[in-house]
Swiss-Prot record:
Reported modifications of this chain: Highly glycosylated by host. The high number of glycan on the protein is reffered to as 'glycan shield' because it contributes to hide protein sequence from adaptive immune system.
Note in the entry: Inhibitors targeting HIV-1 viral envelope proteins are used as antiretroviral drugs. Attachment of virions to the cell surface via non-specific interactions and CD4 binding can be blocked by inhibitors that include cyanovirin-N, cyclotriazadisulfonamide analogs, PRO 2000, TNX 355 and PRO 542. In addition, BMS 806 can block CD4-induced conformational changes. Env interactions with the coreceptor molecules can be targeted by CCR5 antagonists including SCH-D, maraviroc (UK 427857) and aplaviroc (GW 873140), and the CXCR4 antagonist AMD 070. HIV-1 lineages are divided in three main groups, M (for Major), O (for Outlier), and N (for New, or Non-M, Non-O). The vast majority of strains found worldwide belong to the group M. Group O seems to be endemic to and largely confined to Cameroon and neighboring countries in West Central Africa, where these viruses represent a small minority of HIV-1 strains. The group N is represented by a limited number of isolates from Cameroonian persons. The group M is further subdivided in 9 clades or subtypes (A to D, F to H, J and K).
Name of this chain's protein: Envelope glycoprotein gp160
InterPro entries according to UniProt: Gp120_core_sf, Gp160, GP41-like, HIV1_Gp120
Region (CD4-binding loop): 364-374
Region (V3): 298-331
Cytoplasmic-side positions: 705-855
Family statement: Belongs to the HIV-1 env protein family.
Length: 855
C-alpha cells in the first residue's frame, strides 16, 4: 500500500528512479570485458628452426654428383611470393643470425658427405723419391721464382698391391707446394719428400666425378614459420628496418668458398655498403658490398693429362701423368680501370665512416696460403692468387686520387696464381682433401661483388687508416648474402578483450580445425587489430596450404633421390621441416581444443579481462594498435591468460557433465523438461488470453443488455459508495465514529486505467480461484494421504496376519512331517532288527532240527 501511495504522490520520482536503475544496470554490464581468443592473427616471434632448400639443379649441369647435392632440394617456385608489410618495423642482426650458422653447418655436412665414399690417401703417406720436372715442359716461361711455383716433381714411391705382402713402384707428378722434404731439409738437392699434410691431417681424395661448381640454393622456411626480409637499400645489417617484407624462400645463394674477394654474390642497389659488427674494433671483419661488379677472368693455360694409379684393393689415386708445354703461369686478369674506380669508392666510404682523410690498402700481413692469397675453385682446380697487385695503393679522400700505387700502366691487373692439389679444409683443423688433376685447359670467369677487409690496429690518431684483405671464416661469406633475412615463428593464437562473453549452451560438437600457419596472411601485420580481425577467414584458409605444399615437396625430394638409398642433409631437413610443421599444427589445435575453440576463428570465453594485464581502452586497443604491438604489451601475461582459459573451460565441461547426468531422470520426470515447460507456459498464456477475451466480451454484452433495458451507465468519474460492514458505525456530527478507509472509490481515469483495473481484477480473481484450487487440491491430497495411510496400515496388518498364519502352518507342517518321519524310522529300524535276529538264529534252528532228527 505504501508503494502505491508513493506512486500516486511522486509519479515523476518513481519514473526517474526506474530509468536511473536501468542506466546503471546497462553501464555496469557494458564495463565488463572478457577474454576472446583469435586464431590466425598476424603475430610472429624470433625463432630458430630447420630450414630446407630449393634449387633448380637440373637447369645448370646434368651430372651424376655435385658436392652441393641439390638434386635433393625441392624445385624453386616459378612465381615466388613477397608480401610487403606496411607500418612494420623489425630489428635485424646479421652477426647473430642463426641462418648463417645453419648454412655453414649444411655446407660442411655436404662436403663431408661428398668425400665419404672417396678414397682415403693414408697409404700414400710414404717416402717419395722426387726429381725436378724436365725443363722441356717449361716452354717460354722465364724467371726462377715463377718456374718454382709451377714446377712439378716427378716422384716414385712404393705401394701395396692386391696381394698385401707385395709392393710395386709407381710414378706420379706432384706440385711443389703439395710436398715437403723429409726432416725439414729444404735444400734444392733433397730427393726424399712426403705429402705436406701427412703429419697433421687425414687426407681424402675427392671423387673424380664430383663437381665443385656452385649452384644457387634457396633457403626456405617450413610451414608455421616465415622469413622476414629487409628491403632498405642502405641497410647495414644491424638495427631497425622500416621496409620489411615476408618471403617463403631466400634468393639463390651460391655457396662460393673463397677468401679476400667475394665472388658471384648480390650487389648493393644504390651505394657501396660497409658492414661490420664493430667498425672501431680492428679484430672484427669488414664486409664490403659493391654496387657494381668487377669481372675477374682466370685461366690455367697449359693442359694436364691424368692417370689412375692403383693403391690397393678397389682404390685408385688420380695423378698428373704429363703436361703440354707451359706457355704461361696460371693467372687471373682484372680491369685496372674498373678496379681502381671500385677501390676509390670503397676508400671514400671507409674514410667517411671512420672520419679519416687517407685510406691505405696493403697486402695481407701473413698466415696460411688460404688467408694471404685469394683462394677459390676454378673449374675443379684450387687457385691461390697473389692479390698484392690489388691491395697496394693509397687514397686521399679529399681529392679522391690514388697515390703511391705500385701498379704499372697496363690496362689489366694480372694476379699470379698457384695451384694446389692438397687443400686444407676450411671446415676445421685436421682435415685435408686431395683434388684430382683436371685434364685440359681451364678457364673461368667470375664477378667480384664484395671484399673482406681487416683494419690495422694500434692507437694511431693520425688521419691515415690501413686496410688489408682478410677472410678464412666462411660464415662471413654467408653473412654477405643473408644479412637482410631473419626467421620468425608465426604465433597464430591471440587474445584480446571484448564485450562478448561465451554463453554456456548445449555441449558443442568439436569440428575439425584448420591447417598450420603459412606466410600469406602476414600482409595484415601492419593493420590495426580491428582491421586485421576482419580478414581472419581469408587468412585462416591459407593455413593448411603450408603443410600440403610441404608434403608435396617432400615426396618429390624423396622420389628424386630414392635411387641413392640414402638421404643427404637436404633430405633430412625436408623430413625435419615436415615433422616440425605437423608439430606446430597439432600444438595449436591442442590448445584450441583444450579451450573449447576447435574450428573457430573467433572464440569467446568466460574469463573476465583483468585491467592489470592492460588498462587501455577498448577503442584504443582495436583502432590504434597492431597485433604485434598488442602482443608485445601482454606478452608477460599470455601464459596466465592461457591457464585461466583452460581452467574456465575445464569447469564448464564439468558443469556440462553434471547437467548431462541429469538426463537419466528424463524418463521419470519428463514433464520437467524445458520443452515441456515452454508448452505449459504457452498453454497458460492462451488461458489467460482467453479469460481476458471472455471478460471483455461479457462486459460488452452486459453493457449492451443494460442499455437495451433503458439503463444509462454511470460516468467513469462517479464516486460510488463502498459497502460497509454491519458492525462499523456511521460517523456522527462530532466525528466520533470511525469512517471506513474506502467509503467510495473512483472507477477509472481513462482507457489505460480501465485496462489496468480490469487486468488487476482478473489477476485477483485468478489468484483467488487458484488459491481455492490449491486449497482443494491440498485437501484432496490430505484426504488421499490419510486414506492411503489407513490403507497402508490395513495392508500391513493383513500382511502381518497372513505371515503369522503362514508361519504357524509351516510350523505345523514341519511337526507333522517330523512325527511321520520318526514313526516310519522306528518301524524300519524294528524290521531291520527282527530280520537281523532271524538271520542270527538260522544256525540255531538248524542245529535244533538236526538234534530232533537224531533223537
Amino acid at each position: 500500500m505504501r508503494a502505491r501511495e508513493i506512486e500516486r504522490n511522486c509519479p515523476n520520482l518513481w519514473k526517474w528512479g526506474i530509468m536511473l536503475l536501468g542506466i546503471l544496470m546497462i553501464c555496469s554490464a557494458a564495463d565488463n570485458l572478457w577474454v576472446t581468443v583469435y586464431y590466425g592473427v598476424p603475430v610472429w616471434k624470433e625463432a630458430t628452426t630447420t630450414l630446407f632448400c630449393a634449387s633448380d639443379a637440373k637447369s645448370y649441369k646434368t651430372e651424376a654428383h655435385n658436392i652441393w647435392a641439390t638434386h635433393a632440394c625441392v624445385p624453386t617456385d616459378p612465381n615466388p611470393q613477397e608480401i610487403e608489410l606496411e607500418n612494420v618495423t623489425e630489428n635485424f642482426n646479421m652477426w647473430r643470425n642463426n641462418m648463417v650458422e645453419q648454412i655453414h653447418e649444411d655446407i660442411i655436412s655436404l662436403w663431408d658427405q661428398s668425400l665419404k665414399p672417396c678414397v682415403k690417401l693414408t697409404p700414400l703417406c710414404v717416402t717419395l723419391n722426387c726429381t725436378d720436372e724436365s725443363d722441356e715442359w717449361m716452354g717460354n716461361v722465364t724467371g726462377k721464382n715463377v718456374t718454382e711455383d709451377i714446377r712439378m716433381k716427378n716422384c716414385s714411391f712404393n705401394i701395396t698391391t692386391v696381394v698385401r705382402d707385395k709392393t710395386k713402384q709407381v710414378h706420379a707428378l706432384f706440385y711443389r707446394l703439395d710436398i715437403v722434404p723429409i726432416d725439414n731439409d729444404n735444400s734444392t738437392n733433397s730427393t726424399n719428400y712426403r705429402l705436406i699434410n701427412c703429419n697433421t691431417s687425414a687426407i681424402t681424395q675427392a671423387c673424380p666425378k664430383v663437381s665443385f661448381e656452385p649452384i644457387p640454393i634457396h633457403y626456405c622456411a617450413p610451414a608455421g614459420f616465415a622469413i622476414l626480409k629487409c628491403r632498405d637499400k642502405r641497410f647495414n645489417g644491424t638495427g631497425p628496418c622500416t621496409n620489411v617484407s615476408t618471403v617463403q624462400c631466400t634468393h639463390g645463394i651460391r655457396p662460393v668458398v673463397s677468401t679476400q674477394l667475394l665472388l658471384n654474390g648480390s650487389l648493393a642497389e644504390e651505394e657501396i655498403i660497409i658492414r661490420s659488427e664493430n667498425l672501431t674494433n680492428n679484430a672484427k671483419i669488414i664486409i664490403v658490398q659493391l654496387n657494381e661488379s668487377v669481372a675477374i677472368n682466370c685461366t690455367r693455360p697449359y693442359k694436364n693429362t691424368r692417370q689412375s694409379t692403383p693403391i690397393g684393393l678397389g682404390q685408385a689415386l688420380y695423378t698428373t701423368r704429363g703436361r703440354t708445354k707451359i706457355i704461361g703461369q696460371a693467372h687471373c686478369n682484372i680491369s685496372k680501370e674498373d678496379w681502381n674506380k671500385t677501390l676509390q669508392r670503397v676508400a671514400i666510404k671507409l674514410g667517411n665512416l671512420l672520419n679519416k682523410t687517407t685510406i691505405i690498402f696493403k697486402p695481407s700481413s701473413g698466415g696460411d696460403a688460404e688467408i694471404t692469397t685469394h683462394s677459390f675453385n676454378c673449374g675443379g682446380e684450387f687457385f691461390y692468387c697473389n692479390t698484392s697487385g690489388l691491395f697496394n695503393s693509397t687514397w686521399n679522400i679529399n681529392n679522391s686520387e690514388g697515390a703511391n700505387s705500385t701498379e704499372s700502366d697496363n690496362k689489366l691487373i694480372t694476379l699470379q696464381c698457384r695451384i694446389k692439389q692438397i687443400i686444407n679444409m676450411w671446415q676445421g683443423v685436421g682435415k685435408a682433401m686431395y683434388a684430382p688433376p683436371i685434364e685440359g685447359q681451364i678457364n673461368c670467369s667470375s664477378n667480384i661483388t664484395g671484399l673482406l677487409l681487416t683494419r690495422d690496429g694500434g692507437t694511431n690518431n693520425s688521419s691515415n687508416e690501413t686496410f688489408r684483405p682478410g677472410g678464412g671464416d666462411m660464415r662471413d661469406n654467408w653473412r654477405s648474402e643473408l644479412y637482410k633475412y631473419k626467421v620468425v615463428k608465426i604465433e597464430p593464437l591471440g587474445v584480446a578483450p571484448t564485450k562478448a562473453k561465451r554463453r554456456v549452451v548445449e555441449r558443442e560438437k568439436r569440428a575439425i580445425g584448420l591447417g598450420a600457419m603459412f606466410l600469406g596472411f602476414l600482409g595484415a601485420a601492419g593493420s590495426t587489430m580491428g582491421a586485421a580481425s576482419v580478414t581472419l577467414t581469408v587468412q585462416a584458409r591459407q593455413l593448411m596450404s603450408g603443410i600440403v605444399q610441404q608434403q608435396n615437396n617432400l615426396l618429390r625430394a624423396i622420389e628424386a633421390q630414392q635411387h641413392l638409398l640414402q638421404l643427404t642433409v637436404w633430405g633430412i631437413k625436408q623430413l625435419q621441416a615436415r615433422i616440425l610443421a605437423v608439430e606446430r599444427y597439432l600444438k595449436d589445435q591442442q590448445l584450441l581444443g583444450i579451450w573449447g575453440c576447435s574450428g573457430k576463428l573467433i572464440c569467446t570465453t568466460t574469463v573476465p579481462w583483468n585491467s592489470s594485464w592492460s588498462n587501455r581502452s577498448l577503442n584504443d586497443i582495436w583502432q590504434n594498435m597492431t597485433w604485434m604491438e598488442w602482443e608485445r604489451e601482454i606478452d608477460n601475461y599470455t601464459g596466465l591468460i592461457y591457464r585461466l582459459i583452460e581452467e574456465s573451460q575445464t569447469q564448464q565441461e564439468k558443469n556440462e557433465q553434471e547437467l548431462l547426468e541429469l538426463d537419466k531422470w528424463a524418463s521419470l520426470w519428463n514433464w520437467f523438461n524445458i520443452t515441456q515447460w515452454l508448452w505449459y507456459i504457452k498453454i497458460f498464456i492462451m488461458i489467460v488470453g482467453g479469460l481476458i477475451g471472455l471478460r471483455i466480451v461479457f462486459a460488452v454484452l452486459s453493457l449492451v443488455n443494460r442499455v437495451r433495458q433503458g439503463y444509462s451507465p454511470l460516468s467513469f468519474q462517479t464516486l460510488l459508495p463502498a459497502p460497509r460492514e454491519p458492525d462499523r458505525p456511521e460517523g456522527i456530527e462530532e466525528e466520533g465514529g470511525e469512517r471506513g478507509r474506502d467509503r467510495s472509490i473512483r472507477l477509472v481515469n481513462g482507457f489505460s486505467a480501465l485496462i489496468w483495473d480490469d487486468l488487476r481484477n482478473l489477476c485477483l480473481f485468478s489468484y483467488h480461484r487458484l488459491r481455492d484450487l490449491i486449497l482443494i487440491a491440498a485437501r484432496i491430497v490430505e484426504l488421499l494421504g490419510r486414506r492411503g495411510w489407513e490403507a497402508l496400515k490395513y495392508l500391513w496388518n493383513l500382511l502381518q496376519y497372513w505371515s503369522r498364519e503362514l508361519r504357524n502352518s509351516a510350523s505345523s507342517l514341519l511337526d507333522t512331517i517330523a512325527i511321520a518321519v520318526a514313526e516310519g524310522t522306528d518301524r524300519v529300524i524294528e524290521i531291520v532288527r527282527r530280520t537281523y535276529r532271524a538271520v542270527l538264529n538260522v544256525p540255531t534252528r538248524i542245529r535244533q532240527g538236526l538234534e530232533r532228527l537224531l533223537l
